[in-house]
Amino acid sequence: MCFGDSLTAGFQAPTADNPRGVMTPYGSFLQELIGSVVRVSVSGVCGELTGEMVTRFRPVVLAQQPTHVVILGGTNDLGWNRAPADIMRNLLEMYELALAEGITPVPVTVPSVRVGDDLRSEEGRRWFAEHLDRRRQLNGLILGYAQSKRLAAFDLFAATLEPDSQQLADRYSNDGLHLTTSGYRLIADRLYQEVFARDELSEPRGE
């Protein structure tokens, strides 16, 4: 199961090529890669905070008993200036709930943001630096937890980063926050390569 907010739902900002902002969830691309061995379900709610994800976790995830649950959340919390430690407490609760039920959690880090020309102003640079720092703090906690539990995790932040500017690469986002089809395909490709291609996915349960 793929569980999270708009980045799991596959939201895209409307463009000339995609005027309706059609959803392209990475879970659909992951299903194509995995094939018919297992069913990949997607549960993403746009605008959702990690506390709301915790509330949904039991009836949505635990009720289905998937073999794995990919958990991507925290971007909206950061947008509301929630502290990384508080966000991590919610993510940790979901990781631990999954493990207690024999479900393998797959933690995913939150991506950077793209502010473009706003970096030309001192105020814009300060805003970006603050947001980048909190993202790094949260992602460090996510990856540290995964390492401590010997869990496979996907570093979406690093995978979609523009190294020179430390912003979300423009080829992966057209609004500075959500991903493009290329970005969502990247998540699926990397999850398949780094997590699911290594696992035995022959059980009749869903992912």
Q: Across the structure, where does each feature detected by a protein language model lie?
A:
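Alpha-helical cap/lid subdomain in secreted, periplasmic
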Residues: 29-36, 52-207
